[in-house]
Amino acid sequence: MAEEPQRSPAPTSPFAFTVPSNSLSELPDIPPDRPVLIAGPTASGKSALAARLVEDGGGAVVNADALQVYDCWRLLSARPSAAEEAALPHRLYGHVGARQTYSAGHWLKEVAGVLAEGLRPVIVGGTGLYFSALTGGLAEIPHTPPEVRAAADARLAEAGLARMVAELDAETAARIDLQNPARVQRAWEVLRATGRGLARWQAETAPPLLPLSDATALVIRPDPAWLAQRIDSRFDLMMADGALDEVRAALPDWDPTLPSARAIGAPELVAHLRGEIPLDEAVAAAKLASRQYAKRQRTWFRNRMRLWHEIRLP
């Protein structure tokens, strides 16, 4: 492994999670040079756990969250603060413009570069697809042409999710989350653009960049009621720290069809800034959206990460 720079202790974030001592005792023995993967739902404290492991054992905190890559969202995505990023090595945070195309394939290529640096990676996030691509490989699916993406946006808006599901090939429909509009639209686009279903492309997956057997994989499984309270409290902190101003800064170039617009709370606060709903309704809707997102994450992790070491909270 590469020689690491001297570090000062990591500062405390307004969203910081104090890792319970009983949770640290549940950790398996982790050799200092072994890659670590940490998955967990939003607001579960996974970023603080990653920082703790890097502070204690060295390495770099590597982002595996699809929204924390965007430069426009530090507060709404709960990205580490500037002070936290300066105190410990961090990679792949806030480096993508809001209007840029960024996919799991882009992330995987950048992670390959991070692994080549030689620092022990502690890869942390809530985007299950990133971890799946990292440890299981990712199919080389051709880029979706803009006209197909536009047609998919229009189809979803006009016909609805159920109709798009009905237009998928049976093999793909049996494998993806049919309640997730982004996943359904992506599968629809692939079928229209290539004439082959997403499942067929995925059957030609390349070898994984980091096989699960070569890493210590941790998944946080919080109590749902405990997590819901943390989600609500954290959003209040985000608002107090200037989340509304962050969204206001993004408003002139706001495009709801962009992946960056999927930041939890952004559509709701945009609606308020446009005079469509009162602030209290926007905040309540954002909190609800966060809790619903966390539920989807927990389901995904439960179904796909059965071989990962569980950390139960609180």
From Swiss-Prot:
InterPro entries: Dimethylallyltransferase, IPT, P-loop_NTPase. GO terms for biological process: tRNA modification. The keyword Transmembrane helix does not apply. Its EC number is 2.5.1.75. Residues 1-25 are annotated as: Disordered. ATP binds at residues 40-47. Substrate binds at residues 42-47. It catalyses: adenosine(37) in tRNA + dimethylallyl diphosphate = N(6)-dimethylallyladenosine(37) in tRNA + diphosphate. SUPFAM superfamilies: P-loop containing nucleoside triphosphate hydrolases (SSF52540). Its cofactor is Mg(2+). Keywords: ATP-binding, Magnesium, Nucleotide-binding, Transferase, tRNA processing. One of its GO terms (molecular function) is ATP binding. Monomer. Catalyzes the transfer of a dimethylallyl group onto the adenine at position 37 in tRNAs that read codons beginning with uridine, leading to the formation of N6-(dimethylallyl)adenosine (i(6)A). Belongs to the IPP transferase family. PANTHER family: TRNA DIMETHYLALLYLTRANSFERASE (PTHR11088:SF60). HAMAP family: IPP_trans (MF_00185). This is tRNA dimethylallyltransferase. It comes from Cereibacter sphaeroides (strain ATCC 17023 / DSM 158 / JCM 6121 / CCUG 31486 / LMG 2827 / NBRC 12203 / NCIMB 8253 / ATH 2.4.1.) (Rhodobacter sphaeroides).
